[in-house]
Swiss-Prot record:
One function term, GO molecular function aspect: protein-L-isoaspartate (D-aspartate) O-methyltransferase activity
Organism of provenance: Helicobacter pylori (strain G27)
Annotated catalysed reactions: [protein]-L-isoaspartate + S-adenosyl-L-methionine = [protein]-L-isoaspartate alpha-methyl ester + S-adenosyl-L-homocysteine
Protein name: Protein-L-isoaspartate O-methyltransferase
Any Pfam family: PCMT
EC numbers on record: 2.1.1.77
UniProt keyword S-adenosyl-L-methionine, yes or no: yes
Length: 209
């Protein structure tokens, strides 16, 4: 049963960012508390990003809602997430997309996220321990690709794994700031469709740990 606290959190998000009905329903369906480390459970329904292990963070629920909506979610089937983290973003995506694939480079985070998602019965979410810069070629092409970490550029491997006409949303490092950009794939290349807003994400890092 969805908690009143989670509902009120979604109300607060909606006041700041007008939510697509599908995004609001997805956010209300997933209890953020499940993904928050025990010392921070009392902050689970605030709009703050919260610390996890390995110098990583669970994103603000406002950010999760925005990133989900920026994907343009109507009439889509599959999404690839780069940077699973706690699994919260993937869980929200699972309420909208038929198939969710998420790659995590930190093994301890991968194991915890996979267990959380399994315990929630989210059978349409598939998580892989791997270098996110290489994507997940096995199930490509994807209708959407979402970066949950900040990239300096988009690797060719991920462009290749995006469906022609598909959308990729990513925080991009530009000089001394990060901005969220939405790209569309046209003629096998990415074109910036829209610069959405400034942001603050942990960086994409090569390799695994």
């Amino acid at each position: 049963m969805n908690s009143i606290k989670n509902h009120l959190m979604c109300e607060e998000i909606h006041k700041r960012f007008h939510l697509h009905p599908k995004v609001r329903k997805a956010m209300e369906s997933i209890e953020r508390e499940v993904f928050v480390p025990a010392p921070f459970k009392h902050f689970a329904y605030t709009l703050n990003a919260l610390s996890m292990q390995a110098q990583q963070y669970i994103s603000s629920p406002l950010t999760v809602a925005k990133m989900t909506q920026y994907l343009e979610i109507d009439h889509v089937d599959s999404v690839l997430e780069i940077g699973c983290g706690s699994g919260y973003q993937a869980a929200v995506l699972s309420q909208i997309f038929r198939r969710v694939f998420s790659v995590e480079r930190i093994e301890s985070l991968y194991l915890e996220a996979r267990l959380r998602l399994k315990n929630l019965g989210l059978d349409n979410v598939h998580v892989k321990f791997a270098d996110g810069n290489k994507g997940w070629e096995q199930y490509a092409p994807y209708d959407r690709i979402l970066f949950s970490a900040c990239a300096k550029n988009i690797p060719q491997a991920l462009i290749d794994q995006l469906e022609e006409g598909g959308i990729l949303v990513a925080p991009i490092q530009e000089n001394n700031e990060q901005v969220i950009k939405r790209f569309v794939k046209q003629n096998n290349a990415l074109r910036v469709q829209k610069v959405l807003e400034k942001c603050s994400f942990v960086p994409v890092i090569d390799g695994v740990q």
